[in-house]
């Protein structure tokens, strides 16, 4: 396949992630939107790695690193959301004013 198809798919994923990040008030949806953004970046890394030099695996190694960081981010983010839900009984981003007394 040509590079432009991968780039178009990655751009579409990135735009969907940005839209979800901007419009969503639910904390879990925000985390899912961030994961979409990271997957768009992974798709770009893999596409450019294959397009520029398919014998080197630098893009694949960096993609595995990004997937690992994304998994850790999701685990920490969900733990924070769960802790806030237990205290506030909501996952609405407007209600996350924890710095107020």
From Swiss-Prot:
Pfam families attached to this UniProt entry: Oxidored_q2
Localization in the cell: Cellular thylakoid membrane
GO cellular component term of the entry, any: NADH dehydrogenase complex
EC identifiers of the protein: 7.1.1.-
Keywords: Membrane, NAD, NADP, Plastoquinone, Quinone, Thylakoid, Translocase, Transmembrane, Transmembrane helix, Transport
Catalytic activity line of the entry: a plastoquinone + NADH + (n+1) H(+)(in) = a plastoquinol + NAD(+) + n H(+)(out); a plastoquinone + NADPH + (n+1) H(+)(in) = a plastoquinol + NADP(+) + n H(+)(out)
Topology versus the membrane: Multi-pass membrane protein
GO molecular function annotation: oxidoreductase activity, acting on NAD(P)H, quinone or similar compound as acceptor; quinone binding
InterPro entries linked: NADH_UbQ_OxRdtase_chain4L/K, NUOK/Mnh_C1-like
PANTHER family (alphabetical): NADH-UBIQUINONE OXIDOREDUCTASE CHAIN 4L, NADH-UBIQUINONE OXIDOREDUCTASE SUBUNIT ND4L
Quaternary structure annotation from Swiss-Prot or TrEMBL: NDH-1 can be composed of about 15 different subunits; different subcomplexes with different compositions have been identified which probably have different functions.
Similarity comment text for this entry: Belongs to the complex I subunit 4L family.
Name of the molecule in the record: NAD(P)H-quinone oxidoreductase subunit 4L
Organism: Nostoc sp. (strain PCC 7120 / SAG 25.82 / UTEX 2576)
Gene it is expressed from: ndhE
């Amino acid at each position: 396949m040509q590079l432009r198809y991968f780039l178009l798919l990655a751009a579409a994923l990135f735009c969907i992630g940005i839209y979800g990040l901007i419009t969503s008030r639910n904390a879990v949806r925000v985390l899912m939107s961030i994961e979409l953004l990271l997957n768009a970046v992974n798709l770009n890394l893999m596409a450019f790695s294959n397009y520029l030099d398919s014998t080197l695996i630098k893009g694949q190694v960096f993609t595995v690193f990004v997937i690992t960081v994304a998994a850790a981010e999701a685990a920490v983010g969900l733990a924070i959301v769960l802790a806030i839900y237990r205290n506030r009984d909501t996952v609405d981003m407007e209600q996350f004013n924890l710095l107020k007394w």
